[in-house]
C-alpha cells in the first residue's frame, strides 16, 4: 500500500487454491504492498516570493534531516533558484552558505566586486546628475530604463552554478540529480511557459526576471519575465508532468488584494499579475506555509527566511512522515550527490561565439574574450575576468552567457549580445547660493563592430567657469585592448566680484583666463 495509490489483491469468497497457488498468493500478499512502498514518489513544489522564497532552503534542510526523499521539484522565481540548486546537486547546507555569502548579497544589488571592475573602460567622472540613452528613430519609446539593477554579476553566477551541470546532462532537466521544472511568463501571449529542457541557467534566469528590476531575456525568440506573473505556485506542473504519489508544497506568496481607487500600486499589480492557485491539486499532499514577513527585496534577512521555512516544516513533519513511508539516510543521499557531481565536466572554454543583431557575429566580442589562433583554453578564473572586461564596454548594453559542451569535453561559450543605443545624453551641474553655479551637458555617439569607437562632445557653462571638450576614441579589441584617442579642450575662467547666479552680467570683469589645448593619447591597460 502506498498513500494515494492503493494496490489490492482480491480473492472472492469460496475461491479454492492448491498448495502451490496458496504459496504464490501468500508471497503476493506480503510483497505486493512492499513493491508499492518502494515505488512511492514525492514531489516538492516551491513558490515564488522574492527574498521570502529563501525559506524553501529551510524546508529542504528539515526534509533531509528527517530522511524524507524528494523525487521531483517544480519552482517559480525564487523557488526556481532554490530548487534548481538542489536539483543540480547542491546540498541544503551549501545552498544556505551561498545565499548568506557576500557575493550573493552583491549580486542582488547589481554591484560588482572590486576585482571584477575594469577601470580602463569606465568613463571619467564628470558633472552629470543623470543620463539617458537613445536612438534617433525611437527617441521616446525606447529611451526609458527597463531595469533597476545591472545583471552582469547575477548572470555569470548563474552560469557558474548551473552551466556545466546542464550541459553535462544534455540540457535535459529529467537527468538532473532530481528531475526539475520551472516556469516563466510569456507576456506577449499572456501564458506561463514550463521549462523541462534547455539551458538550466537560462531557465532559472527567465523564471526570476522580476519586471523592471532585471533585464528581461529571450528564450527561443520569446521575451520572458518572472514566472510568478501567471503561475506563482506550479503545483499543477508537478501533477501533470510527474504525477507523484505525494506532493509537498512550500508557499510564501499570496494573491494581491483587490485594487482600490486611490492605490496605484494595487491597480498595476492586478493588471500585471494573474491570481495563482496555492492549493495542492490532489488529496495526497501537504502544504507548508512559512511565516511571510520579509519584503520582496530584503535579501539581507536571509537567515530569518531560512529559519522560518525550517520551523514551518518541523511543525508538520510528523504528518509528512505518516504519509511518506520511504526514507533515505544522510549517508545515502550524500553518496548519490557525490556520484552525480562527479560526472559533471569541469568548466574549460575553448571557443567563443555570439549572437548579435539578428544572428550576425560581433568580432569585437569574440576577440576580446579568447586568443583563437593560439587554441587558448580558459579556466573559470580567466573566463570570469574577461567576461567582466567585455561587459564594461560602453558600446554594449547587455550580454548573456550560455555554455555548450564540445566533443573534446571542453565548452563553447555563446554570448547573447545587445548593443547599447547609439546616443547617450548626460545632464547635470553644480548648483550653489554662491556665484559658482555651473551647468553640464554631454552627448556621446557610440559604435561597435570589428572595433569600438565613440565621439564625445561636452560643455560646462556658468559665470565663473566655461568649457568645451571634443574627443574621439577608437579601441582595437584584444585580450589587453589598445585604444587611440584624440581630444580638443577650451576652458575659460572669469574671476569677478559678484554673488550672481547664471545670468547676471557684472562689468567690468577683473580677470579672465582662457586656455586651449589638444592632444593624442594611446591607452593600454596593465591590469583591471
Language-model regions, residue ranges each:
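Solvent-exposed, well-ordered amphipathic alpha-helical segments
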Residues: 1, 18, 46, 53-54, ...
